[in-house]
Amino acid sequence: MSKIVLDNVRKSYGGNIEVIKGVSLEIADGEFVVLVGPSGCGKSTLLRMIAGLESITSGTISIGERVVNNVEPAERDIAMVFQNYALYPHMTVRENLAYGLKNRKTPKEEIERRIAKAAKALEIEQFLERKPRQLSGGQRQRVAMGRAIVREPAAFLFDEPLSNLDAKLRVQMRVEIKRLQRSLGTTSVYVTHDQMEAMTMADRLVVLNAGHIEQVGTPIELYEKPASTFVATFIGSPSMNLLQSPESAAWQPGRAITLPSGGYTFGVRPEDIRILEEGDQDADGFNAQVRIEAVELVGAESYIHAALSDGKPLIFRVAGRSTHNIDEMVRVGASATDVHIFGADGRRVSD
């Protein structure tokens, strides 16, 4: 196991197109860190730089106590799990697991020990003599993970490994990956664009935007105190409602909100908004009259899509099956403690 340290890492193409913009990050020994962000934010490029598959333009990358800027990928003591499994189709599962170890001249007895240990942990013992074409997508992904595990590396690097799986299997596999990582205690860096994967798997999240870090923290820290409007809308589903401060009475802050000078944006998560009853005095953060435009039933709860009097959209959540009708007018509100305030630059200005 090893910590991974990135110090002011930059990556440019053609000398003037910078895609990684001075990223500094320390990943602790045994930590599971998830790099998350939209397409094109630089998360996969950053992972490939750690792996040695992409060169860096400036800065340093250390694995353990060793700077690995100029170290070949095979010598970095890392193992990578890819989206496309990367299995040899003509080999059995056992042969796929053993291939890398044989290339490193690992003794036969040690190879068998590692294969048996990984196969048991991944519950693929009954598939060892099968070839990849005889396996399901989930089973193939377990084999790909097994090939990484038998390496017994200093760190695991996961590049969107669940993207090819269906929704049910993704849920199962993310639980298995996290369980295995905890049992092995291996430092892990995991890339995904799926914020649900990120929230449920990470010890810490690193939210990337256009090649730089927007925020680093635990999933609950990023959810409850997003550092910017970008993080606020990226983390959480449905995303946080963001509304510019209006001059009209369509949507006004309540008495408990202290406003910063200059332009500002209010943020409220859908689950923090409730429909107000007559005489309700608890909505001291904001309250507004809205018109219901759509109702989505998603099992144990409903999402109501509404419009403010100035036409701006607002989404909020109610428990169970909503009894409200399209075009119905309702008053909604939230407590001051649930209102997030962001300045004109999009950065958080309130606790």
From Swiss-Prot:
Assembly description = The complex is composed of two ATP-binding proteins (UgpC), two transmembrane proteins (UgpA and UgpE) and a solute-binding protein (UgpB).
Q: Does the keyword Cell membrane apply?
A: yes
Q: Does the keyword Transport apply?
A: yes
List the subcellular locations.
Cell inner membrane
Catalysed transformations (reactions) = sn-glycerol 3-phosphate(out) + ATP + H2O = sn-glycerol 3-phosphate(in) + ADP + phosphate + H(+)
Task: Tell me the domain of life.
Answer: Bacteria
Q: What does the record say about its membrane topology?
A: Peripheral membrane protein
InterPro entries in alphabetical order: AAA+_ATPase, ABC_transporter-like_ATP-bd, ABC_transporter-like_CS, ABC_transpr_MalK-like, ABC_transpr_MalK/UgpC-like, Mo/tungstate-bd_C_term_dom, NA-bd_OB-fold, P-loop_NTPase
Q: Which UniProt keywords apply?
A: ATP-binding, Cell inner membrane, Cell membrane, Membrane, Nucleotide-binding, Sugar transport, Translocase, Transport
Residues that hold ATP according to the record: G37, P38, S39, G40, C41, G42, K43, S44
- The organism encoding this protein is Brucella abortus biovar 1 (strain 9-941)
SMART domains hit by this protein? AAA
Q: Which enzyme class, named as a word?
A: translocase
The record's Gene Ontology biological-process terms are: carbohydrate transport; glycerophosphodiester transmembrane transport
SUPFAM superfamilies reported for this sequence: MOP-like, P-loop containing nucleoside triphosphate hydrolases
Q: What is its main location?
A: membrane
Q: Which gene encodes it?
A: ugpC
The Enzyme Commission number assigned here is: 7.6.2.10
Function per UniProt: Part of the ABC transporter complex UgpBAEC involved in sn-glycerol-3-phosphate (G3P) import. Responsible for energy coupling to the transport system.
| Listed name of the protein | sn-glycerol-3-phosphate import ATP-binding protein UgpC
Q: Which Pfam families match?
A: ABC_tran (PF00005), TOBE_2 (PF08402)
Q: According to its UniProt record, which protein family does this protein belong to?
A: Belongs to the ABC transporter superfamily. sn-glycerol-3-phosphate importer (TC 3.A.1.1.3) family.
Q: Which GO terms describe its molecular function?
A: ABC-type glycerol-3-phosphate transporter activity; ATP binding; ATP hydrolysis activity
Q: GO terms for CC? A: ATP-binding cassette (ABC) transporter complex, substrate-binding subunit-containing
Q: List, for all copies, the residue spans of the domain called ABC transporter.
A: 4-235
